């Protein structure tokens, strides 16, 4: 594996974690928004990732088992999907956003889970950044060794 591959893999990981962090931020920002209808209520969003393989093939866990000789080349974001779990309906007839039956709908966002996901994404981003810095140090040491004969 070349250093360029390490940079590509770490860079794709950082990009994926940035998407994850942005999605978490959006979920937290909308956690307390309300609506008078189910259709207009914010639903939690989650990114979907896939491994990129040498030769451009990508896929989820099924393709990992189909081609065990393929070397991973990074991660890509396939998209962001809405969580289809139930929304919370509260009977609050005095709420300004209540519908004609007195119900207000709250998003299906669990702030505690989102905070844990944010910490995980942040640490993953940091790990990828450290991997890039380590590869950069190895590259510099390799260049010095070739140019100056240093060890």
List the predicted regions and their residue ranges.
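Amphipathic alpha-helical polymerization modules
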Residues: 1-144
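Positively charged, low-complexity/disordered segments
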Residues: 145-151
């Amino acid at each position: 594996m070349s250093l360029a591959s390490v940079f590509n893999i770490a860079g794709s990981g950082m990009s994926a974690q940035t998407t994850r962090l942005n999605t978490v931020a959006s979920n937290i920002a909308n956690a307390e928004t309300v609506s008078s209808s189910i259709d207009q209520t914010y639903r939690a969003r989650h990114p979907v990732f896939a491994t990129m393989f040498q030769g451009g093939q990508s896929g989820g866990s099924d393709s990992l088992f189909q081609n065990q000789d393929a070397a991973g080349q990074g991660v890509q974001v396939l998209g962001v999907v809405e969580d289809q779990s139930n929304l919370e309906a509260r009977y609050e007839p005095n709420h300004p956003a209540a519908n004609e039956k007195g119900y207000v709908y709250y998003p299906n966002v669990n702030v505690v889970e989102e905070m844990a996901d944010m910490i995980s994404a942040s640490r993953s981003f940091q790990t990828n950044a450290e991997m890039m810095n380590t590869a950069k140090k190895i590259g510099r040491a390799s260049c010095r060794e070739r140019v100056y004969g240093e060890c």
